[in-house]
Every structure is written in C-alpha cells, then in structure tokens.
Amino acid sequence: MKLTTSEALVKYLIAQKIQLDNKVVSFFPFAFAIFGHGNALGLGDALERNRKAIPTLRGQNEQGMALAAVAFSKAQLRQQCAVVTTSIGPGATNVVTAAAVAMANRLPMLILSGDTFQSRRPDPVLQQVEHFDSPITTVNDSFRAVTKYWDRVNRPEQLLNTLPNMIQTLLDPADCGPVFLALPQDVQVETFDFPEEFFKEVIHQIRRPRADSSSISKAIEIIKSAKKPLIIAGGGARYSQAHSELSEFANKFGIAVVETVAGKSTLLASDPAWCGPVGVTGCDPANKLAEEADLIISVGCRLQDFTTGSWTLFKNPAHKVISINTARFDATKRNAVAIIGDAKESLVELGSLLGSYKAELAWSDKRVSTRDEVLKNIQTRTSEKLDLPSYAQVVKLINEASSNEDYVLTAAGGLPGELNNNWLTKSKDSFDCEYGYSCMGYEIAGAWGAALAYESSGRAGKVISMVGDGSYLMLNSEILSAVNNGNSIIYILCDNKGFAVIQRLQTSNGSKSFRTMFNDSDLDKPVNVDFVAHAKSMGANAKKVTLESLKEELTSAKNYAGVSVLVIDTHPSKWTEGGAFWEVGVSGSSNDSEIQSAHARQVEGKAKRRL
C-alpha cells in the first residue's frame, strides 16, 4: 500500500481503538492543529482527507491547544489521547510548556511537529535555528527533556518501528507521558509501500500490572504492626479507577484517607474515611493525622513537596512508608516499601490478606473528629464579613450551587489551595487541579479540553473553571476556540488585581511586594482591564457579578449552551490558613530583619525533615 509518511501516520492513528464504558472508541478521537508551512501541506493534507475519521480542531495558540489536549486526557482518565500538530520553529516550541505539564502529570499527548528538510538542500529554511556545530540539531530537540518518547522520522519506513513504540508509551500505566515525533517537511510527503496489516484495527486495553508477591507479603507484615496507619490518595488512584476499592479498604480496616491535589475526587467528601487534603495546600486537621501516623500508605502518589511538606510533615520517628504505584521511580522514593503494581488490584490483594486487622480504635475514631473539624473550618472561614469576598467564599458558593455531574477545574496561583480546602467532592473524578506543573493558563485552555471530554462521551453536567486574573491575562485565547467549536464552559474569573498569592509569598518571607500586583506600576494610573468586554469580544457570554448575585448568574450560565465568563472582584490578601512547612529559598545574608526571621524559620523547618 503506497502512502506518504503523513498518510500512513494518520491511517495508523485512526486504526487505534480502545474499549471505554463498554464501547469501542478511537484512542485518538481528534487532533488540535495550527497549520503553518511546516505541517500544512503534508500532515495537514492527510488530516483534511480524513476529517471525519479524526476531526481536526483549530486552536489559537499552540500552548493553549496543547494544554487542552492534556486536560482532555486527564478528564478521560488517560484512556484516550489527543493529537497536537504544529509547524516548525515557534509553533513547535510553543508546545514545550504544555509537554512539560503532561510529563509532570504522567498524562498522554501525541505531538507532531514539522521540522527542517532531511535533505538539508534548502537550508537554512524559514524558522530554522542553526547550530553551527551540530547540523542535525533543531529546536525540536528541546522536547527531549519534556517527553517520554522522542523521535525524528527520517524515512517513511521508520514509522513501522516508531509508531508501535509510541502507542505503547501512551498506554503504559507506569511510563505514560507525552510523545513527540519530529516530521521533516520533505519526509512528510515521501512515499513507501507499507504492509496492509500495519493498518489493521487494534483494540487496546490498559494493563493492570500485579505486584510481586514478596512485596505484598512485606507490606502485610508492616501494616499488621501499625497502630496509626494513614492513606494518602494520589492521582494514580483515580487513573486506576480504584475509588470503591480504596473506600472499602479504608473503612474495613479503620484507616483515614487524606488526599493530594491530583487525588481529590477519588473519594467523596461524604465517605466516612475521607479526612481532607494533606500538605502545603492541605488543612491542619489532615496534617495533624500525617504528623502522628506511624505508617503512611501512599496510593498512586508521587510524593511531591506540597504533599510531604518538603518532607517535614511525617513527624512520628517510627513512621514507615508503603508506596503503591505502577511506576518504579515513584514507588521507591525515600526508601519506601514499594508495591509496584496497579492501585486497584494491589488494594484488593492487600485487603484479602489482612484478615481481622484493624487500626487502633482511638486512631480510627479520629476520623470522625477530623472530618468534623475540616467541615467546621470551612464554615468558619466562609462566614467572615469582608469588603470583598475571599476566594474561599466564592469556592464554597460555587460548590454548593454545582450539581453532582459538574466538573471543576483550576491550576496555578492561589486557587488550588482554596479549592483543595473548600471544595467538597460530590462525585468521583469531578475535580481537576493542575498542580503537577502549576501552569498558568491551563484554567482557560484546559477547560476547553475537559468540555470536549464531557461532551464527546455524553456526560451530563458542566465544566466550571475557576481562574485568576493573572492566569486569564497570560493565556485566554482558547475561549475563542471553545466558542467557535460550540462547546459549553463556565469560567469564574476571580479578579484580585494581580498575582496576589505571589505577593503573599513575598511578604510572608520578609520581602516587599514587588511587581506582583497590577497597581505596582510606574504610571500614576495603570490600566484596569475590562474583563467582561474582553471576554465578550471573543464571543463569550460575560457578566460582572457579586457574591450576592453569583448563584443566580451561575444558574443562568448553566442553562446557556455556549461559553460564559462570570467576573467577580475578590479579596487580594484573605487566604485559607493552615497547611504545612514548605521549603523556599530565603536569603541567609540579608540585612533586613524580617528576611532574617524568615530565613530562621526556614532553617527551623528544615531541621524537622526526615528521610
């Protein structure tokens, strides 16, 4: 079958299927594209000829559409993958940040970018960055640091090797992440006689690797000796779809469950085992459990510093760590007893072997008091009378007004901590906070990807994205993409006049507020952005609201078929307090007394760190 490289690539993608909700669907359901001279005539032409089998959506910004691809795969629990294609040069490098988001969060995304000519005859070509000492190097090599699999296709027949490697990387529960293929412009249109069987339909299944029996036995021994065990639920618990197994395990053995940002919505807030968020963006009641626990059972968690309080949170000198993870690298961190296997299967196996084991009764009973304290703290902090509403008050109102079917999304700035603390999960897999890479702009673009996931799979409910004014200004153009594609999204734009959470970081560590708030300008009257007018200019239904009118306007937005943007002024310095120690770089040689005090607090905090 004589095909060009581009035609063969698209044909192969179309043949890849997966079973999802008892239906066979495309593993690559669509592509995001911004076409330029590096991909329009080769890959672009092949996509156009197959526009029904693999629809192509046009983005406005390469980073934005790639972030949408990341959020799509997250909403689909890594069971489907979007394709992203760009031209060469700036179009390609614009995707590097989004690739890093996928890499940090262990999420699949396929990136296909144009490259220079393999023949080198027309060099240097438009948008080529020349390396005088390495003619084979192009800017596409920058993706090596932010992808799980990287290749440059120099001959059409190389697809026979690289595409199977690509698909296995995207499907691998342990090594899942972004894949990058560089496609030289001349190679895109070169032909080869491909074997027909290469394009036969394949229905994939994501593997559930079982743990080694010796690691299970060792973990059983440790758990049985523990009096105060604590489970930390991470994102891997969700991707394994271990929701009911985790709940059953925790409640059967009387173990509290605290959650990371990625693990939120594994358990419902109504689950008796649920005890709130842990770590730097967590709450004091949950962190107290972590401090006292003699055993940490990490389920699908990569144990980031925001989870572990920069490894100062687990204060019990006798504590041990068991880590359940498909990825060896994550499972073995900090000398943990590693259970390298699927979370769902591992919990079932552990549960079947623990017999009559129970956590210490007084420890199990703490679950009730901890939950009560978490809920009481939410009520207390959201009842305060303020001149402008706090993030917490806005989050609580949106939470109460949302349905069980709705999906909330956020990313960088102060909102992750506020949602992590004040959002009570009503249904499983209904929460997405991108805090693996904490990428500003994900809130806008990611919501588009999540909406595509919801709408393509026929799920009820709305995608509600909470975004700060700083993130909005950084990357907002995919609002237009969502409008033009007919998607339905609600954006809650919280305007606190700048990067207020970084101002908080500055001032709480002795520094002065510097270039974080928009009024810190050399102009007497810096410009205030009219966010309502801006969103309207991209076709969104936009309104300025207050805390008092927000519920009514949210109801109206939920009945609107398109994109809505509700703008609300929020307090720049009222935050949810609590959390854990976080190591940051504070000068040890400053003459400023406040910075000296902050440095001393850092030294004191780091002294509590355990292996």
Residue spans of the language-model regions?
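Thiamine diphosphate
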Residues: R120-S134, A331-T332, I340, L347-V348, ...
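Active-site diphosphate/adenylate-binding microenvironment
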Residues: P29-L43, R371-S457, K608-R610
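N-terminal alpha/beta PP-like core and its mobile active-site loop of ThDP/TPP-dependent enzymes
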Residues: M1-S356, L397, A401-N404, A460, ...
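Active-site-proximal structural scaffolding
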Residues: A250, L289-A290, Y391, L475, ...
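Glycine-rich beta-strand-to-loop/alpha-helix junction loops that act as flexible
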Residues: A233-G235, V299, A412, V467-G470
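Phosphate/pyrophosphate-binding active-site segments
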Residues: N154-E157, F180, A318, I322-A412, ...
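Short alpha-helical "patches" and their helix-cap loops
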Residues: S26-F27, A362-D365, A460-V467
